[in-house]
Amino acid sequence: MWHLLDLNMLEGVVRLLMFGLEKYGVRDSWKYLENGEDRWYSACIRHLNAHQSGEELDSESKQMHIDAAILNLIFLRYHYLKNKKK
């Protein structure tokens, strides 16, 4: 089933994961964010709004807003599923 996904589309997402690791020094620090579901949803919307407004790159990471939104959705999904198990 994984053959259906062109992994090259995720290159920007992986670059953002590397940026986060360099910035915070902890792998998977996004998993431990308080109120993760709400915060990752808000972050996703911010990046989508910036993209919709014509801003291609995030000023801090220098990566595409659309890639940041995709990564935020992945993080949001993780927190949603974690909270659903409670």
Question: Residues of each region from the PLM?
Answer:
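Intrinsically disordered, low-complexity regulatory regions
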Residues: 1-86
